[in-house]
Amino acid sequence: MPTIQQLIRSKRQLVKSRTKSPALQGCPQRRGVCTRVYTTTPKKPNSALRKVARVKLTSGFEITAYIPGIGHNLQEHSVVLVRGGRVKDLPGVRYHIVRGTLDTVGVKDRKQGRSKYGVKKPK
């Protein structure tokens, strides 16, 4: 506990809240170019091959982003849109690739929850 004299000398420091997606730099999304597209395995209780991509953003950051949905068309040099949002069972993956924009196509044969996977309304 500081004395009154110590508080006069220097006021209390504000606690700054850390952002969960620093590479976006306060923007809702960022554009980037895929440098590597590969699969990784999740943390302990789960088992799968999760599709991820290394992306070089326009902000200069190189990040790992998750590719949601079943099947994708991404490869090296694909231009993608990246949003925030981590994947709980993949350590270090704090971003999602937005489906249905730029070089990323929407998920094929998707009927429900279409807006999250960039799919137009079926006729």
Curated annotation (Swiss-Prot):
SUPFAM superfamilies: Nucleic acid-binding proteins. It comes from the Eukaryota. GO terms for cellular component: chloroplast; small ribosomal subunit. Gene3D superfamilies: Nucleic acid-binding proteins. InterPro entries: NA-bd_OB-fold, Ribosomal_uS12, Ribosomal_uS12_bac. GO terms for biological process: translation. It is found in: Plastid, Chloroplast. Pfam families: Ribosom_S12_S23. One of its GO terms (molecular function) is structural constituent of ribosome. The keyword RNA-binding applies. Keywords: Chloroplast, Plastid, Ribonucleoprotein, Ribosomal protein, RNA-binding, rRNA-binding. With S4 and S5 plays an important role in translational accuracy. Located at the interface of the 30S and 50S subunits. Part of the 30S ribosomal subunit. PANTHER family: 30S RIBOSOMAL PROTEIN S12 FAMILY MEMBER. Belongs to the universal ribosomal protein uS12 family. This is Small ribosomal subunit protein uS12c. It comes from Anthoceros angustus. The lineage of its organism: Eukaryota, Viridiplantae, Streptophyta, Embryophyta, Anthocerotophyta.
